[in-house]
Amino acid sequence: MRLVQLSRHSIAFPSPEGALREPNGLLALGGDLSPARLLMAYQRGIFPWFSPGDPILWWSPDPRAVLWPESLHISRSMKRFHKRSPYRVTMNYAFGQVIEGCASDREEGTWITRGVVKAYHRLHELGHAHSIEVWREDELVGGMYGVAQGTLFCGESMFSRMENASKTALLVFCDEFIRHGGKLIDCQVLNDHTASLGACEIPRRDYLNYLNQMRLGRLPNNFWVPRCLFSPQE
């Protein structure tokens, strides 16, 4: 196993099975964040993650963190909160604001550089990256974004500026995703937050098998059309 230097003249990636064990999943460096390369990466179970000032690093960890949307864990207190939720939830209304929110709401710093923002905004314009927004009246207070691969959604980041805002985004999205044929959410690497929401780890080989099947699936043609998903009760 060795770290592969990507060429700017080819969007090809090495097999994820060749990723390093330490650090877990590091596969390649270099290349660029062009739409074609990003889409090729997601189709192969690879994602970019790097610190500002570092070269672009590409990862495919083993095991892989995933969330089966029907297994989303919602605490009793969150269920009570959601019944009286003050939030309105929309899809694809404000992708730029959501990714900016994810970039700025990280006290410990962020990997979401200006180049990353620009790259994913371009994916959004092409219909591949999508956002869920949570509003308190007219103020954006939370949200999440990711990349669609058929009936699999690759979650990238979320943010919250008010109580339970990001959890509300995920809860409402999971419900809508399931109802329209969505199968799986990729969480990349397990952490305490995603584990508390019901995410689990599966072998990379299993994830790649799911990906290869699900990316060929289809959600309804109008699933990603900008729309309101949830409104507070009057």
UniProtKB/Swiss-Prot annotation:
Source lineage: Bacteria, Pseudomonadati, Pseudomonadota, Gammaproteobacteria, Enterobacterales
Function: Functions in the N-end rule pathway of protein degradation where it conjugates Leu, Phe and, less efficiently, Met from aminoacyl-tRNAs to the N-termini of proteins containing an N-terminal arginine or lysine.
Record SUPFAM superfamilies: Acyl-CoA N-acyltransferases (Nat)
GO cellular component, one term: cytoplasm
Major site of localization recorded for this protein: cytoplasm
Pfam family, one: Leu_Phe_trans
Sequence similarity: Belongs to the L/F-transferase family.
Any one biological process term the GO annotation gives: protein catabolic process
Reaction it catalyzes: N-terminal L-lysyl-[protein] + L-leucyl-tRNA(Leu) = N-terminal L-leucyl-L-lysyl-[protein] + tRNA(Leu) + H(+); N-terminal L-arginyl-[protein] + L-leucyl-tRNA(Leu) = N-terminal L-leucyl-L-arginyl-[protein] + tRNA(Leu) + H(+); L-phenylalanyl-tRNA(Phe) + an N-terminal L-alpha-aminoacyl-[protein] = an N-terminal L-phenylalanyl-L-alpha-aminoacyl-[protein] + tRNA(Phe)
HAMAP family reported in the protein's UniProt record: Leu_Phe_trans (MF_00688)
The UniProt record lists the keyword tRNA processing: no
Compartmental location: Cytoplasm
Protein keywords: Acyltransferase, Cytoplasm, Transferase
EC number: 2.3.2.6
An MF annotation (GO) of this entry: leucyl-tRNA--protein transferase activity
Protein name: Leucyl/phenylalanyl-tRNA--protein transferase
